[in-house]
Swiss-Prot record:
Function: Transcriptional repressor for the nicAB operon, encoding the upper aerobic nicotinate degradation pathway. Acts under non-induced conditions: repression of the nicAB operon becomes alleviated in presence of either nicotinate or 6-hydroxynicotinate (6HNA).
Deletion consequences: Growth in nicotinate or 6HNA is similar to that of the wild-type strain. Mutant strain shows constitutive levels of nicotinate hydroxylase activity, and these levels are similar to the induced levels detected in the wild-type strain grown in nicotinate. On the contrary, the NicX activity shows the same induction profile than that observed in the parental strain.
Cited Gene3D superfamilies: Homeodomain-like (1.10.10.60), Tetracycline Repressor, domain 2 (1.10.357.10)
Species, as recorded: Pseudomonas putida (strain ATCC 47054 / DSM 6125 / CFBP 8728 / NCIMB 11950 / KT2440)
Induction: Expressed at a basal level under non-inducing conditions, but expression increases when the cells are grown in nicotinate as sole carbon source.
Residue ranges of DNA binding: 37-56
Protein name (record): HTH-type transcriptional repressor NicS
Record GO terms (molecular function): DNA binding
Superkingdom, taxonomy of origin: Bacteria
Keywords: Aromatic hydrocarbons catabolism, DNA-binding, Repressor, Transcription, Transcription regulation
């Protein structure tokens, strides 16, 4: 009986922590790190301030956990991809499409990263897990490039980091700046066709950047 009670308490604790984390993602993505308040998060999580400090220690540590959480969620979604390495060019297109679609479907990912960059990566540097998480993300691209090189399709001098930066930046910049650029360029970048055209463009661009 004691074991069952302990198991139930552990599950309740996990749910409470998860609810707080999800609420923090929503609050920080809307208000930023500076504007996001612990009271807002606890209210949204249907918890209380004391529980946030119990599980996370401080607002800063909670934000670091949020950063780790959004990257881990991205990696988990990316890990579900089933890419056919027999066709490296198509696999690359599918990876670019996944990254693009993820940014579109998860605007909180884009806004929280923008917030952290405003703070010059202060909290990211304090994370003990982000480097490992980045390795997982880049690791999905590596076998695609290696397969393309083995078939003589991709250049042998490709830097994996540069290739990943190219793809991530082409997906991220559009989504993080679409509001201002829509006004500046007098183009509705939120338009469905505009987004589809951009995905085609960046997929072609990524391939041209890697081909021999």
């Amino acid at each position: 009986m004691q074991t069952r009670k302990t198991g139930v308490r552990a599950q309740q604790a996990d749910r409470t922590r998860d609810n707080i984390l999800k609420a923090a993602v929503k609050v920080f993505s809307k208000e930023g790190f500076t504007g996001g308040r612990i009271e807002q998060i606890s209210t949204l999580a249907k918890s209380n301030d004391r529980m946030i400090y119990y599980y996370f220690g401080s607002k800063e540590k909670l934000f670091i956990s949020v950063l780790e959480h959004i990257y881990a969620s991205f990696n988990q979604a990316e890990a579900k991809l089933r890419l056919d390495l027999a066709d490296p060019e198509q696999a690359l297109r599918e990876l670019v499409a996944f990254i693009w679609d993820y940014y579109v479907r998860h605007p909180e990912f884009v806004t929280i990263l923008a917030t952290e960059n405003l703070h010059q990566g202060l909290h990211a540097r304090k994370s003990q897990n982000l480097r490992a998480l980045s390795g997982e993300a880049v690791g999905v691209l590596r076998p695609i490039i290696e397969a393309g090189q083995a078939k003589g399709l991709f250049r042998d001098d490709i830097c994996i980091t540069h290739a990943y930066l190219m793809i991530a930046s082409l997906c991220y910049f559009y989504n993080s700046n679409r509001h201002t650029l829509s006004s500046f360029l007098a183009v509705d970048l939120a338009d469905k066709q505009a987004k589809a055209d951009w995905l085609t463009f960046i997929s072609d661009l990524a391939l041209r950047g890697l081909r021999r």
